[in-house]
C-alpha cells in the first residue's frame, strides 16, 4: 500500500473519481459544485495536486483530459484508518472500540459484526 494521505477536500474529489472515472474536469465540476461550492479552477488545482501526489492520472484524448484514480479506495481507507487510530487512540483498536461502546455509538448489529470479525481474526491467528 502507498503512503498517500488525503485532505478532507481530496477525499470528496477522490470519491467522485472512484465512483465515476474516467472524468473530464467539466464532469467533475458538475458532480461536485452543488455539494462543495468549488469552482472549476479549484477542482483543477486539486486534480494537479493529487496528480503530483501520485493519486490521480491525467490522460489526454484529443483535446480532452480525462482524470482517473491511481490509488484504490480500499488502500486510501486503510491509510486513513491507520492514521486516525494512531493519532487519536495511540494505535489501540481496543481503546477506540471501548470509547465508541461507552458513548453508545454501537448498534446491536455493529456489536454482532464486531463479534464475527473478532472470531474470524482469532481463527486466523490460531492457524499461524
Question: Where are the regions that the model predicts?
Answer:
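Glycine-centered, phosphate/nucleic-acid-interacting loop/turn motifs that mediate DNA/RNA or nucleotide
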Residues: 54
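Conserved segment of winged-helix/HTH DNA-binding domains
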Residues: 71-97
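Short, hydrophobic-biased segments on the C-terminal half of alpha helices
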Residues: 47-48
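Short, cationic-aromatic polyanion-contact patches
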Residues: 3-9, 61-80
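Short helix-coil junctions and helix-kink-helix linkers
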Residues: 30-38
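Pre-recognition alpha-helix immediately N-terminal to the DNA-recognition helix
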Residues: 11-15, 27, 95
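C-terminal regulatory/oligomerization modules of transcriptional regulators
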Residues: 79, 102-128
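Short acidic, hydrophobic short linear motifs in intrinsically disordered regions
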Residues: 23-31
Amino acid at each position: 500500500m502507498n503512503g498517500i494521505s488525503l485532505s478532507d477536500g481530496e477525499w470528496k474529489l477522490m470519491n467522485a473519481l472512484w465512483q465515476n472515472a474516467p472524468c473530464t474536469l467539466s464532469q467533475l465540476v458538475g458532480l461536485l459544485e452543488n455539494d462543495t461550492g468549488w469552482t472549476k479552477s479549484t477542482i483543477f488545482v486539486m486534480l494537479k495536486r493529487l496528480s503530483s501526489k501520485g493519486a490521480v492520472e491525467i490522460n489526454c484524448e484529443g483535446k480532452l483530459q480525462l482524470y482517473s484514480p491511481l490509488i484504490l479506495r480500499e488502500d486510501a481507507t486503510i491509510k486513513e484508518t491507520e492514521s486516525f487510530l494512531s493519532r487519536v487512540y495511540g494505535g489501540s483498536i481496543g481503546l477506540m472500540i471501548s470509547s465508541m461502546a461507552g458513548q453508545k455509538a454501537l448498534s446491536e448489529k455493529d456489536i454482532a459484526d464486531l463479534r464475527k470479525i473478532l472470531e474470524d481474526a482469532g481463527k486466523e491467528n490460531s492457524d499461524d
